[in-house]
Structures are given as C-alpha cells and as structure tokens.
Amino acid sequence: MPILIHLSDLHFGPAYLSHLGETILKEIDAVNPDAVVVSGDFTMRARHNEYRAARDFLEKITRPTLAIPGNHDQPLFAPIERLVNPFGRYREYINRATDSTLSIGGLFIVGLNDNRRILPGGFWSGAQREWLAAQFASAPSGAVKVVATHHQLMWEGKARPAGFWFPSRALAFLARRGVELVLNGHTHVPSAIQSPEGIVVARSGTATSSRTRHGCGNAYNLITIDEKQISVFVRRFDEQSDGFIAAQADAFPRRLNIG
C-alpha cells in the first residue's frame, strides 16, 4: 500500500516555525512513507538565506522527495531577475528542474511548475502539457499516477476558473492520462475532494508557517492508497500535545472502481 506525505507552503523566512519543521522531520522518519511531495512556496520572498534554510530542510528528509516551486519562490524584490530568470534561485538551491518526476513504491508522480511571472492562479503551457502526456505514457504499468502543482485545480467542489488554461480542462486532460490523485497547496487551507472525473484533489495546509488562514492551523497530509480507495488524512499541529494529530480523514473510491 503506497504511503505519501504531502507538505506545502513551508515559507522559510520570518514566519517559519522551526519547531514544527523539526517535528515534521521526526514524523517522516516514524511513518517511513514511500515518498514525500512538497508542493511549492519553500520561501517567503525567495531570498538566498531562505533558500539555504529550505535546502537544509530537504537534505534532512530521509525518504525520496519530489519538489516543485510556488509563486513565493520567485524573487519579489529583484524585478529584473524575476522577469528574466524567475526560478534561477530555485534551481540553484532546490532542483535544477522545475518540472520533474518520481517513480517509486507503486507511485508515478509528476511535479509541474504552474507559476508564471505575472499570471495569477496557475497556468500550464502547451509544451508542459505535451511533456506531461509523454511522462504518463511511459509510466510503469500498474503505478498510481499522481500530479503535484502549487495552485489548486478545484475550489468548493468545482473546477476553479483561473489562468488562461482552465482547470476544468486540466482535470479532463489528466483523467485521459489515467491520473488518480492531484496534490497542491497555495491557500494554506487543507481539503480533499473528488472531481467529476474521479480524480482525488488534495490540498495541504501550510506545514510550518505562522501565516495560517481561517483558523485551520498548521497541517500537512498523510495519504494512503490501496486497491479500493485513496485516503487523505489531515494532520494538524496541536499545541497541547506538542505534535501533529489526526484532524480529518476522507476516503474516496479509486477511479478504476467508479461506475
């Protein structure tokens, strides 16, 4: 049974809560998941010191990890660099590739950089869609296909209409490639829903930033996949126990079992 830990919006910088970061590293060691996915916003303002801290954190993760950038990972206070080389610092410190894959433990995960210099809400280029289709065409037989992006594709149970390539089209595109699970972050609010196509869309809260929203607190997702269902467990930090505890659980039938 594949097990994933899904983190997002770590936001190294002034709002980073180091104690929570250390706690998450211990939980990763204890759970020993097949893979860890970090769906963007490693930094607050893409400063070099923030990226160095993010790199140090990633180097402490003992399991295979897939990372993608978020909108905060483009330098805000270096406008020329943001224009001509927005992910240069990300490539220097985190990963030379902003789109990447990870195949392990019955999982085939594709990470897609959906950030643009000025477009809000996420966007996939034509070249990215071609690359994505090629990756899934070569996926190992029987592997669970997963996509990680920073921006959410669904909001309140509906495809979120943002960007120039609408999420409803993105979900249909992914369904045709056999994708069963999409991971994202961005809003700092955890959720898990299933699209009309049967794709589970799981959003992680902010794992380690003090900038939580809507009273959700700090949280990450623990995801398990068996033959029948995909289960998403939100683990939220609890000050009383000084650790992450189970806060919400959702289980969805796998696409191959729908209809």
Segments from the language model and where they lie:
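Active-site neighborhood of phospho(di)ester-bond hydrolases with catalytic His/Asp-centered motifs
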Residues: 7-8, 36-41, 65-71, 113, ...
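Extended active-site neighborhood of metal-dependent phosphoesterases/phosphodiesterases
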Residues: 52-131, 139, 173-175, 222
